[in-house]
């Protein structure tokens, strides 16, 4: 495999080319990309955890340092002002020397407010990309050039096509997340609480809870019916029935996002349903290819959900086609089949049909689908179907013409298990689909 340094060199060349094109299209001279700043909690002197500007970490794997600035023009070596204060109160990251620093000019910035004297004097035609517009105004950036929509749309669109460097980083993030999932399953099998399972996960991945790319979903029993459950009970339930873990990891700023579901017992209806959802997820991935709309795969999985609802006699006396047509599958899988993945967990440009930002919304029937694009080589996506037993979604179906088709007794028996979700991260290639998650033998 090529070294990360050589992959990064090519990555920078790609970003430079995209920058040249964007600057030419929008008649700008350069982009000033801000890592961000710390913001204090209201009426307090403690800051919120720092989250770096994703457009900044696209260029450099600097994810924990605020007050950094990057100047890029698509021609000259990118120039990074790296915040390096004299500070005995807080940890100060040293000036980086790593695989990537040969391709970026790194300059120490001793004072956060010192950037103004270091930038080019003529700034009227520089675009600012960052989270603090007032800082850009103070630096003399034109208001119309602060986070210009056309530039951001352009950069977001092409972020969908991962470079080989980005894919290498994402494969490393997968390894970390897989380690965490294995440790979490072991903790579940030993009877730990959600809180303690989460600690086991973080320890195995080498992350703090502020470093993971999203809040871990560690859901035992009926908590698995809450799609984004993040409470973390300190006490283990008296009876362990099920465990849904949706948790990721980050490497050089790139995310992994995996979900697995386990049954405490191997010989009940729920365990068989977990196996069947897993099998159908793999079967769907086996059909995926470039040139097909992601929406089509979402719709196809509703047909697979219908098959499972019929097989497990959760819905009875109705054809699979009629289930999908009348949206009886909807309350059981209320979210989309997945989303784009990269520098952000829900990565950008999911609805963009071109580099001008043309928007194609999700189908009205499936409003929570996060991706409506045609699959193309270089795209990275999650595939995360599920079946859940959520009373607020099932309640409207308890009356009306379709109520008789719901096996309410079976549904009540499954509700204490919460739900099921299986999620892998896949890369679209020209002639195949790479499943980064299964390649690491995570069952």
From Swiss-Prot:
It catalyses: Xaa-L-Pro dipeptide + H2O = an L-alpha-amino acid + L-proline. Pfam families: PepQ_N, Peptidase_M24. Its EC number is 3.4.13.9. One of its GO terms (molecular function) is metalloexopeptidase activity. GO terms for biological process: proteolysis. Its cofactor is Mn(2+). Mn(2+) 1 binds at residues 257, 339, 384, 423. Binds 2 manganese ions per subunit. GO terms for cellular component: cytosol. SUPFAM superfamilies: Creatinase/aminopeptidase. Splits dipeptides with a prolyl residue in the C-terminal position. This is Xaa-Pro dipeptidase. It comes from Shigella flexneri. The lineage of its organism: Bacteria, Pseudomonadati, Pseudomonadota, Gammaproteobacteria, Enterobacterales.
């Amino acid at each position: 495999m090529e070294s990360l340094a050589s992959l990064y060199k090519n990555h920078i060349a790609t970003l430079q080319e995209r920058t040249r094109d964007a600057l030419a299209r929008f008649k700008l001279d350069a982009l000033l990309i801000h890592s961000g700043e710390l913001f204090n909690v209201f009426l307090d002197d403690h800051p919120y955890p720092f989250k770096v500007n994703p457009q900044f970490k696209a260029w450099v794997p600097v994810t924990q340092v605020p007050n950094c600035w990057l100047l890029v023009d698509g021609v000259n070596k990118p120039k990074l002002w790296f915040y390096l204060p004299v500070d005995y109160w807080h940890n100060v990251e040293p000036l980086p020397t790593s695989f990537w620093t040969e391709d970026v000019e790194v300059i120490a910035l001793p004072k956060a407010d010192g950037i103004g004297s270091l930038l080019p004097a003529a700034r009227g035609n520089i675009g600012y990309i960052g989270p603090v517009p007032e800082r850009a105004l103070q630096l003399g950036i034109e208001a119309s050039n602060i986070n210009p929509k056309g530039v951001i749309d352009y950069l977001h669109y092409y972020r969908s096509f991962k470079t080989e460097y980005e894919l290498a980083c994402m494969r490393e993030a997968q390894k970390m997340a897989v380690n965490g999932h294995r440790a979490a399953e072991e903790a579940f099998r030993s009877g730990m609480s959600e809180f303690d399972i989460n600690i086991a996960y973080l320890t195995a991945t080498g992350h703090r809870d502020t470093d993971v790319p999203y809040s871990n979903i560690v859901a035992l029993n009926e908590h698995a019916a809450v799609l984004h459950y993040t409470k973390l009970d300190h006490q283990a339930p008296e009876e362990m029935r099920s465990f849904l873990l949706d948790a990721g990891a980050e490497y050089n700023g790139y995310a992994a996002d995996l979900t697995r579901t386990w049954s405490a017992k191997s010989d009940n209806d729920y365990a068989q349903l977990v196996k069947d959802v897993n099998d159908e997820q793999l079967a769907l991935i086996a059909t995926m290819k470039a040139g097909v709309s992601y929406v089509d795969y979402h719709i196809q999985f509703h047909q697979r959900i219908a098959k499972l609802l019929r097989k497990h006699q959760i819905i009875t006396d109705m054809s699979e086609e009629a289930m999908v047509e009348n949206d009886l599958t909807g309350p059981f899988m209320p979210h989309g089949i997945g989303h784009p993945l990269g520098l952000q967990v829900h990565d950008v440009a999911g609805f963009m049909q071109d580099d001008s930002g043309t928007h194609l919304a999700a189908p009205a029937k499936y409003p929570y689908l996060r991706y409506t694009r045609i699959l193309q080589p270089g795209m990275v996506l999650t595939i995360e179907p599920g079946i859940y037993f959520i009373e607020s979604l099932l309640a409207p179906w308890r009356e009306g013409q379709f109520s008789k088709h719901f096996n309410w007794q079976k549904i009540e028996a499954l509700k204490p298990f919460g739900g099921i979700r299986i999620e892998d991260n896949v890369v679209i290639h020209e002639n195949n689909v790479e499943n980064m998650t299964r390649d690491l033998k995570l069952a």
